[in-house]
């Protein structure tokens, strides 16, 4: 807890093409070594691939995928009397979104397609259809929370 109050969050500007703030966060998550232009081109090319393959609006596919990936519960380690317990807690809205974006990009990087555009397009389409690595991660997180439900009274 900071002694001098909380720092105001920086305002994130919407992306230049779709005018969407969440998409800007997604682009920032894709970005490596500060190369934002490269990250933007990867994202927009992936969106073009989604448009070609599904015929749907890529922003709708992206929002559906993100909604499907965002976790509701997670576990946090809590030390009680010399033992560590995995305590299930609800995830705040902003953290829910951040985790969803992080998992989408992380599991897209692990995919076997040749280019990053194809990987991101594939992961977004899979997540929109409730399949893929990022959805499995969400389900595993929920299973962990469900398994440790007995320790919910240790919540702080």
UniProtKB/Swiss-Prot annotation:
Keywords: Ribonucleoprotein, Ribosomal protein, RNA-binding, rRNA-binding, tRNA-binding. Belongs to the universal ribosomal protein uS7 family. This is Small ribosomal subunit protein uS7. It comes from the Bacteria. GO terms for biological process: translation. GO terms for cellular component: small ribosomal subunit. Pfam families: Ribosomal_S7. One of its GO terms (molecular function) is structural constituent of ribosome. Part of the 30S ribosomal subunit. Contacts proteins S9 and S11. The keyword Coiled coil does not apply. One of the primary rRNA binding proteins, it binds directly to 16S rRNA where it nucleates assembly of the head domain of the 30S subunit. Is located at the subunit interface close to the decoding center, probably blocks exit of the E-site tRNA. The keyword rRNA-binding applies.
């Amino acid at each position: 807890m900071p002694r001098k109050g909380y720092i105001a969050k920086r305002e994130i500007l919407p992306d230049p093409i779709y005018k969407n703030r969440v998409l800007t966060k997604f682009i920032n998550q894709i970005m490596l070594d500060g190369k934002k232009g490269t990250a933007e081109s990867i994202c927009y090319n992936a969106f073009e691939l989604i448009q070609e393959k599904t015929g749907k609006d890529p922003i709708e596919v992206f929002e559906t995928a993100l909604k499907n990936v965002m976790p509701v519960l997670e576990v946090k380690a809590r030390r009680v009397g010399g033992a560590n317990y995995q305590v299930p807690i609800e995830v705040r809205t902003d953290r829910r979104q951040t985790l969803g974006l992080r998992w989408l990009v992380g599991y897209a990087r692990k995919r076997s397609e040749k280019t990053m555009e194809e990987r991101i397009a594939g992961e977004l389409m899979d997540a929109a259809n409730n399949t893929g690595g990022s959805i499995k991660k969400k389900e595993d997180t929920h299973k962990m929370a469900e398994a440790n439900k007995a320790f919910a009274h240790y919540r702080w």
